Amino acid sequence: MPTTRESPALRALSVAGIVRSIASFQDGIFEDLRPFLGFDYKAWVNTPFDKRLLVQLEPFHALLLPWLADHSIDRLAQLFEALPDVAPLVTETAIYYGHDDLVAHLSAHWRHKATSLRSMDLAAWAGHFSILKRLHEEDFGGCSHLAMDWGARGGHLDIVQFLHEQRREGCTTEAMNWAANLGHLAIVQFLHFKRTEGCTKEALNWSAGNGHLDVVQFLHTHRNEGMA
């Protein structure tokens, strides 16, 4: 009986690598990458650290995690090639949600594409000391005075101490003001004895208004800003 011979073209199209190579010359992006088109990088990076940023982080995180589970971490290469502006968003999402392994991978393999200028600020805001330490040690991403301000506000003494010892960005009076407002006495004490930025009248106003008597007593004894 005659046999049906497969054409060379069909044999070529059965090889996944060849198909991917052919597809790379076509316009558009792979179907699994299309959902990432819905995120505005420029708007994201200009959003301050409050609920407005969480509105963007939460849906991106909800998309990213199952996508990585379906395609493996190696698929990031295609994502970053097709949508390079998405790379820093992946980094910021990994930092905020504490995905240390993903942060380590991005630092090792994608530091030039996936760097965020506010990486350490975001880690401090989220209270992830181990990630902040990694970012510092591997020089992956940026840091500003907001890191210590947010570390103090969140009650993360380990972060405040580390930034004081290892970084030079410092903080603002907002660090002690917010630590006092939220009753973080140990941080108020550390900032008073170890740093020079000080506070404003708001520190005593807020701590008194919120009933943090120990903080009020400390500020009354050691500071001279007074209260309004």
Predicted regions and their residues:
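Ankyrin repeat (ANK) tandem alpha-helical domains that serve as protein-protein interaction scaffolds
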Residues: 1-228
